[in-house]
Amino acid sequence: MPRLLLAAPFLLVLHAAAQAPEDNRPPLFFREDWKEIAAVAPVTQEHVGNPALLLGLYGPGKDGVRKSHHDTPKDDPYYIWLGSCPANCAIALRDKDAFVDLTGLAKIRWRTKQTGFRSVRLTLKLGDGTWLVSDYAEGPSVDWHESEFSIAGIRWRRMDIKTIVEGPWVASPDLSQVDEIGWTELAPGGGTPASSRVDWIEVYGRPVARR
């Protein structure tokens, strides 16, 4: 019995350590969930819910980037829809005061719904102005789908921000100062049958002050 009594505090410490979150995971850098105001195309800064973020629209089809919502079903969210882009388009968000370090255990969480054969891909603008597009793609689903993925496992291609077309592979890009984060289909919108929808996005990374 004395041995058990002596061991009890040690076991409690081990249990507490096991329950504590790891201290090396980056914090939530930003979340965007769009204001619940009337749908519009193209989406404007007025529809951005996070006051720290600035909106950017890109590509020859950028005027078709729509903030959408329907009265039915009743749980239909306010979301970004690329289905009305007449040509390739992309959307991105940037923090007014900070870059974000997406190295290490940085990750993205988002709630999306794609139809047809469409997939939505992550886009990044680096501190030096380079644009990248991910090999990771969130594909179609029958309903809204929440997913999470690590940045470290992604391969990247350069992206032409004027045309929203992928270029050559970029080996080991420096993701320690990312300026803008967004997404694209790398294709014109296909209307309701073939398009992407993003309800909200969360970026987990460490802030880096803008000089």
Cite the ranges covered by each PLM segment.
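Beta-rich carbohydrate-recognition modules and glycan-binding surfaces
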Residues: 19-211
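Positively charged n-region of N-terminal signal peptides that target proteins for export
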Residues: 1-4
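Bacterial N-terminal signal peptides
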Residues: 6-15
